[in-house]
Every structure is written in structure tokens, then in C-alpha cells.
């Protein structure tokens, strides 16, 4: 039965990790109805592994763009010295943007999860950022031209600014992609570049967070049975495959549409969560 639950949760992670609708919010809902019959430590490891599956999809999809080493590229896809230089610059921008989350997130992440990983805080963050998306798209964007239409032209200062917005995503329900896309739009980055940079920014942030949590899991004397390993592997593969589709969908979607739909979706989901939380509290 856990294998079926793992597949469902992998699908949810694969879709919601990259769309700006909060993977945490959806996983909280899923956990209410699709609980894994496992320990709390394993569930935390499970969340880490499905995130790894999601981020590996970015590495695979954008390997050539992100790879500065020609030795790892096919003969027909060798980069010019200029392209290699731009790739290194892109990585520098990604690392600059990742710094605020690393500095602030490491000491606060567990505390924030403990105090805010609940229905009501998540619901409010869903609604707040849903409203933000709608306001930015309807009020801000029409009065400001996009100044960054190519990721190679993204200024280092803008990368840092986007990274500061990513810190806000430490609050469950915010959405890492949602926070960074909002920050990118406010500094004049086009929707396409905002989405793409968000994908890349997830690599050091999510790999780093996953490494720390995996280390913490085994350091505390936990181990995995053969069945548990199988559950993790299945969920990781599903999250990887679904993420590939979700990333392709979002990159195509933002070429013709804005983020208003996602804002409305977040608001509706947030309201549903609040109603459910009140209903559950009423029933005791």
C-alpha cells in the first residue's frame, strides 16, 4: 500500500515543486489523507528524496546549458569559449542568489517548520502570494517593461534580489518558485527568464538542504529496510518523471500567459484549507 501512496505523493511533488503553487501546501493536504505507515524520521527522509527526484529533472533537462565542461558534452554540442564563460557567470549568479537562503535558512529552517508547518499558516501564505501574483500582473507589469529578456543578461544585483525573495519561501506555503518569480518580476525580469532562473536556483538550495537532512537521518542512528528503500526509489523516479513534464509545461505556458491563474488557484486553495482547518477544530 505504501508503494501506491509513494507514487501519488511523487506525482504531487513533481507537479507542485516547479509550479508556483507551493509543494508544501499540497503535501500537507496529501499527508492528511494519504499517510505513509512509517516513522516520522522516514517521512522526513521521504520528503527529501522526492525533492531530489524533482531537482534531478532540472539537471537532466538543462545539462548542456548548465555544463561548463566540454569534455562532458557530445562532439556536436561543444561550447565556444564565450559560451563557457557565460555558463560560469550563470553559475555565479545562481550561487549569489542561493547565499541568503543558505545563511538565513540553515539556522531557522527547523524552527520555522515546527511553528508554521500547519494548515492555517500555510493557508495564509497561499492566499498572500496568490494576491501578490494577481496584483503584480495587473498593476505592476503593465506599467513596467521587462528589462531582462535573456538569462545571460541577468544582472548580479538582480540575482541577489531574487535570492532575498527566496528567503521568504522558508515559510511553508509560500512556494520557493513562487517567491523567486515574484522577486524576478519586480526587478524587470521576463516571465520566461524568471521561471528558468528559478529552476536553476533550486539546484544548490535543494541539493544542499537534502544533503543536510540525509546526513541528519543517518547520524541519528536511523536505517532503511529493503522495502523502505524501494518506496523511496519509486517515489523519486515518479517525482523525476512528473517534474520533467511540469517544467516543460511551465516554460511553454509563460510564453503566452501570465501568472494570474496561479494566483487565483492559490487563493482558492488557501480558502479551502482555512475552511477545513476550522471544520477540523470545530469537530475537535
Curated annotation (Swiss-Prot):
InterPro entries: UppP. It comes from the Bacteria. It is a multi-pass membrane protein. GO terms for biological process: cell wall organization; peptidoglycan biosynthetic process; regulation of cell shape; response to antibiotic. Its EC number is 3.6.1.27. It is found in: Cell membrane. One of its GO terms (cellular component) is plasma membrane. GO terms for molecular function: undecaprenyl-diphosphatase activity. The chain crosses the membrane at residues 7-27, 44-64, 90-110, 116-136, 167-187, 197-217, 229-249, 259-279. Keywords: Antibiotic resistance, Cell membrane, Cell shape, Cell wall biogenesis/degradation, Hydrolase, Membrane, Peptidoglycan synthesis, Transmembrane, Transmembrane helix. It catalyses: di-trans,octa-cis-undecaprenyl diphosphate + H2O = di-trans,octa-cis-undecaprenyl phosphate + phosphate + H(+). Signal peptide: none annotated. Belongs to the UppP family. Bacitracin is thought to be involved in the inhibition of peptidoglycan synthesis by sequestering undecaprenyl diphosphate, thereby reducing the pool of lipid carrier available. Catalyzes the dephosphorylation of undecaprenyl diphosphate (UPP). Confers resistance to bacitracin. This is Undecaprenyl-diphosphatase. It comes from Lactococcus lactis subsp. lactis (strain IL1403).
